[in-house]
Amino acid sequence: MTTATAPTGILLGSFTPGTPEWNEARKGLCVTATQIAAIVGLSPWQSAYELWHKKAGRPTAPFTATPEMRWGSRFEDDVAEEFAEQHPEHPLLTTGTWKHQDRDWQRATPDRLWGNRLVEIKTATHSAEWGPSGSDIFPMHYRCQITWQQDTLGLHEPAHLAVLILPYDYREYVVEYDETDARMLREAAERFLRSVRDGEPPEIDGSEHTYNTIRVQPDRYDPVDVEIPGPIASDYEVIGAQHKAITEQYTQAKSRLLAALGTGKNAMHLGRRIAYRVANEDGTTKQLQPAR
C-alpha cells in the first residue's frame, strides 16, 4: 500500500455548499467524489445518464433534497464530535475542495481531515447495508466516494468512515486505499468525460433519475404521430403488462403480511426482520416498509 504523510492535492478553497463559489469549483468537465459512484452505476442519488446531461449543459429535473439528505447535513457536526471524542490523538479539521495535483478534472471535498487521514461522516436510516463497527461491510457508493477522495488528495493512509444509524447506533469503519479500485474509477471517469466532449450520452438504464432526465428534454409539444421501432414498442407493452401483474401480486403479498402483523411493528421471519409498520397516532397503519 502506498502511503503519504501530507496531501499532494491542491486546495481550491473552502466554500459553503450552494454558493456561487461552491458551484464554480464543481462545474464543467470535472468529476467529484459524490459523482464518481453515479458514473460507475452505483449511486442511489443519481444515474450516469442524468449526470452526463448536467455536464453537457442539457436539461435535468430540478434537484430536491430528501429528508435523509437534510438530516444528514444537520447531524454531521454531531457525528464528527463523537469521532473526535473517541480519537483525540489528532485534531479533527474541516477542509475544503481539492483537485488532484496532475489531473485538474479530479475533484473532492472530504468531510474532515484527521492527521494524514480522511474522515467521511454519514447518517443512515437503517442498518441493512452496514456491518458491525470495524468490519468491511458498508454501502459500495461510499467506498467509491472515499477511494476517490484518497486518490484526489494523495492521502493513501486508511480513511475512516463514521456513521450514525438513526436513532443512536454509532459505528466506525476503516477504508483501505486500493490502487486497483482507484485506477478503475479514474478510467471510468475519463471515459465518461470523453463521452461528454464527444456528445455521446450513456445508454438508457432503468433508473428513475434517467427517466426524469428524459422527461424534461422536450422543449415543445408537437401533436404528431411518431413510429416507434418494434423492439422498443414490444418491451413497453410486454413489460408493462408484466409490471401490472406483479404489482397486483405484490399488493396482495403486502396485504397478507399486514393482516398477519396486526397491531405489531416489526414483521419477523426466523429471527430476521422483513418489514415494519409505520403507524398513525390512532394506531392505524400509515405505511408498510420493507426492511432494507
Describe each region flagged by the PLM.
Residues M1-R292:
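Accessory terminal regions of nucleic-acid processing enzymes
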